[in-house]
């Protein structure tokens, strides 16, 4: 039996692949926002810690874990690595495809703290953060001392999380599917944008190109490295991480 952790485009692809096999599998997401159609799959919702995952795997005879979660879901990645080691269950990491890092036009940041330091050093006063609602608290030193806007998903759970982190709702803007990335940038006139290295399926290239065309500075947080205990696939090739074939990141 196979257990997939998803909630992403990659999760959908994994579902489609396993549905074609015609055998039962489990699909787990943290929340209930992703709408997926399952015939052979069984939906699970809610976060699980290592003990809960190990127990579930033992009870349901899980022999393979597929990590198709967001590249920045570091807690889940670490939990699955722990489960894999302790239960001897292999993990396939369904990785996104990432463009080569542009060192000329993008200021790359190791993590959130590094991003805060570099943005403050450059004296950026108006910032548009496209890093998601869960990063508001991590970036608090920026919005406490400058004008920061966050674009988030237009749903109640996101607004609730923003309020819980103490962020002003007047500086929240909502993602509109299919909307040109330049629309919000032209409306807010930020000096810089802050992104996650979210890959092609995360719209990274479109955001970068929109900012470049408008002369807006770009800061990007590097994706976390994938565990070398995972077997990594990206839909185009199979490799064991780290790999020399991905020279710009050996998330």
Provide a role label for each language-model segment:
Residues 49-101, 199:
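N-terminal glycine-rich phosphate/adenylate-binding segment common to multiple enzyme folds
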Residues 27-47, 161-163:
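N-terminal beta-loop-helix "entrance" segment that forms/cooperates
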Residues 1-21, 26-28, 89-93, 97-171, ...:
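Non-catalytic interface/targeting segments
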Residues 239-244:
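Conserved small/polar residues in nucleotide/adenosyl-binding loops
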Residues 163, 167-169, 175-184, 188, ...:
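A C-terminal functional module that forms or caps the active site or interfaces directly
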Residues 86-105, 214-229:
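Short, acidic/small-residue loops that bind anionic groups at enzyme active sites
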Residues 63-64, 126, 191-192:
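Structural motif
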Residues 41-56, 172-180:
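Glycine-rich, highly charged phosphate/nucleotide-binding loops
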């Amino acid at each position: 039996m196979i257990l997939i952790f998803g909630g992403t485009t990659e999760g959908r692809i994994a579902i489609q692949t396993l549905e074609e096999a015609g055998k039962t599998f489990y699909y787990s997401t943290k929340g209930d926002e992703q709408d997926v159609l399952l015939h052979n799959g069984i939906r699970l919702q809610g976060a699980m810690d290592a003990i809960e995952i190990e127990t579930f795997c033992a009870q349901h005879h899980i022999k393979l874990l597929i990590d198709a979660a967001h590249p920045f879901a570091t807690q889940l990645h670490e939990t699955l690595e722990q489960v894999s080691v302790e239960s001897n269950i292999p993990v396939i990491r369904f990785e996104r495809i990432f463009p080569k890092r542009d060192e000329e036009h993008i200021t790359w940041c190791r993590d959130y703290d590094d991003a805060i330091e570099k943005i403050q050093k450059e004296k950026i006063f108006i910032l548009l953060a496209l890093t998601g609602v869960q990063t508001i608290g991590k970036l608090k030193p920026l919005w406490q001392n400058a004008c920061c806007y966050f674009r988030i998903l237009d749903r109640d759970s996101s607004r609730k999380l923003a309020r819980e982190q103490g962020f002003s709702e007047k500086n929240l803007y909502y993602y509109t599917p299919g909307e040109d990335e330049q629309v919000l940038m032209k409306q807010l006139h930020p000096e810089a944008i802050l992104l996650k290295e979210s890959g092609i399926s995360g719209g990274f290239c479109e955001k970068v190109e929109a900012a470049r065309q408008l002369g807006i500075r770009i800061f990007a947080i590097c994706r976390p490295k994938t565990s070398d205990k995972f077997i990594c696939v990206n839909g185009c090739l199979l490799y064991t991480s780290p790999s020399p074939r991905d020279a710009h990141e050996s998330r």
